Amino acid sequence: MVVCGETMKLVSLGVMLIGTILSVSSEELVGVWLGLELNLYGFLVIMNPDGHYSPEPCVKYFVVQSTGSILMLVGFVSLMEQHVVSGLVMSTAXTVLKSGVFPLHSWVPSVIKNSSWLASGLMLTWQKVAPLVFLSMILPSKSLWVVIVSMAGIGAVGGLNQNSVRVMSAYSSFVHTSWMLLGLTWSSVVFVGYFAVYSLSVGLFFYGCSLMNKMSMGSQLSSAASGMGLLMLMGMPPFLGFLAKVLVFLMSGSPVIVACIMGSVISLKFYIDFFYSMVMKSLVDKNKVEVKAIWSLVICMNIMGGALILVSFI
């Protein structure tokens, strides 16, 4: 059963990969829709491959994505029939819903909260690629700026005082989505660079958190993985998350970059709260403090703080 489950995961990941590539590279609207559907069905298997998790997030995700698919299909048919206005409205609404961006974003935290670590990680990373790319193509620049500013604000404020790591990560993804959308407005290379760094950060963070739930695994590995991923998500120098933001900042000439920066600064609050409440506690094993690990962490934080000060002067 375990081998069968792992095989199903690999097959589903392959289907998701093919679907995303088809959707992004297709020049026809039908190809975009078909790619998104392949991606959806592949991901549904990942969400609950062996039936051990609650079916609620899987059902909710299916309903949301199916609604988006129907709206998108109706919009595409309307565009083919030369009903441009209604077609664009339906297509945009469906893409916004499937992307989980403002104003149809409220379903994301509730689905993430009860999903597995793997499903949550993929939902916050890979599942965003095709819808965001298509959204950047059909939305006018000013409308896209409204989405970017709204996502940065909602993610920063919504993540405050959250007790669930997954929910916190969902709101954090809203802030990072604003950065990715801003990068998409200028260059696909910038988007790919930021997305790669963000995906690596989420992968490390969720991997460390999943290890914390397994008593057979040591605390040092989980602390190192989650701590490294968290620092990258925070955008602290000299980690890659900081460099990715600098790349978008240098390439973007839009004033909405201010909203993205403010969203990232505010989101530091709940990142730091999690850092001290979980990562520092994981360094204590049966009331025995691992002094070397703590001192290494303190030294690392001081070095990064000094680097941040130097960067601010530069």
Swiss-Prot record:
Enzyme class: translocase
InterPro entries assigned to the protein according to its UniProt record, in alphabetical order: Complex_I_Subunit_2 (IPR050175), ND/Mrp_TM (IPR001750)
Gene Ontology molecular function: NADH dehydrogenase (ubiquinone) activity
Transcription regulation as UniProt keyword: no
Membrane topology: Multi-pass membrane protein
Biological process according to GO: mitochondrial electron transport, NADH to ubiquinone
Keywords linked to the UniProt accession: Electron transport, Membrane, Mitochondrion, Mitochondrion inner membrane, NAD, Respiratory chain, Translocase, Transmembrane, Transmembrane helix, Transport, Ubiquinone
Any GO CC annotation of this UniProt entry: mitochondrial inner membrane
Superkingdom of source: Eukaryota
EC id: 7.1.1.2
Catalytic activity from the UniProt record: a ubiquinone + NADH + 5 H(+)(in) = a ubiquinol + NAD(+) + 4 H(+)(out)
Job description of the protein: Core subunit of the mitochondrial membrane respiratory chain NADH dehydrogenase (Complex I) that is believed to belong to the minimal assembly required for catalysis. Complex I functions in the transfer of electrons from NADH to the respiratory chain. The immediate electron acceptor for the enzyme is believed to be ubiquinone.
Family of this protein: Belongs to the complex I subunit 2 family.
The protein, known as: NADH-ubiquinone oxidoreductase chain 2
Organism: Mytilus edulis (Blue mussel)
